[in-house]
């Protein structure tokens, strides 16, 4: 399981790195941004329906619309390993934005659809 989580995180770093490198080549973003990425790998409960899973992942996008500090989200895992069959990423403007998200009304509302179908998850918060 540790290997699969590290593989997913490695892939996410490649994606973020490629995006950053492309932006820098064109005079865009900094090499080491101060944004925070909130990486969550997860396994759904066996009885979670496709509709419930879709609603939970769509909820990640809804959070981004409700909170100014969320700059981007990713909800479609292209490749996963081990028993963590899904992942999502939220990018926050800075560490304060991540702190503002924790315990927010938007998070609490989303938890109503997410937590009942989540079997387990692993979270990493990463910045420079």
Show where each model-derived region lies.
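Short S/T/G/P-rich N-terminal loop/turn motif that feeds into the first structured element of a domain
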Residues: 7, 17-86, 93-100, 126-128
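Bacterial N-terminal signal peptides that target proteins for export
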Residues: 1-9
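Low-complexity intrinsically disordered segments
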Residues: 1, 16-17
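C-terminal partner/receptor-binding element of secreted or periplasmic proteins
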Residues: 115-124, 128
């Amino acid at each position: 399981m540790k290997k699969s989580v590290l593989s997913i995180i490695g892939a996410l770093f490649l994606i973020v790195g490629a995006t950053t490198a492309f932006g820098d080549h064109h005079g865009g973003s900094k090499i080491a941004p101060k944004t925070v990425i909130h990486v969550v790998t997860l396994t759904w409960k066996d009885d979670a329906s496709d509709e419930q899973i879709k609603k939970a992942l769509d909820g990640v996008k809804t959070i981004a619309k409700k909170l100014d500090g969320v700059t981007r989200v990713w909800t479609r895992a292209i490749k996963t390993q081990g028993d963590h069959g899904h992942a999502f990423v939220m990018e926050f403007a800075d560490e304060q934005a991540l702190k503002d998200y924790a315990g927010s009304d938007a998070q609490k509302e989303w938890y109503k659809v997410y937590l009942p179908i989540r079997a387990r998850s692993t979270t990493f918060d990463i910045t420079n």
